[in-house]
């Protein structure tokens, strides 16, 4: 029964994808590069995300996909969701985490907004670490209808389990750009 319900939800959620905005972007940080994609509703609804990040100082990687729900409340957008993350830290074991969290975007004008989000996967929502933490905050400027620029700060860390050390995967400021269609 669960598989049938999940299949129906997946099919119904993709029926409205044509009415959603899509975005493909890249970020270059003080310690990392990141590629990301987003399929999101204009005001309210289900959104999908995907990203891959690499810390080029020592080769640490993380990547994943996410699903969430967004609600627009005038000048603010609130969202909550869950992700499936693959981690390949330099120290410790490769593994998966299923963080849950959310975020907010506060619009100062039609072109400029501030954003912040946080996700965590405590024990039971991951397999190789004790805890996974991800935080992202910054400012975005919609330069044109199809071009967005971002400046922000991103942090991803894991707390070790069973003798595995704590480890920071990403920690630093970044500049980014995205194409929307």
Predicted regions and their residues:
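Cleavable N-terminal export/targeting peptides
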Residues: 1-23
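Short glycine/proline- and aromatic-enriched beta-strand/turn motifs that initiate or cap beta-hairpins
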Residues: 17-69, 112, 176
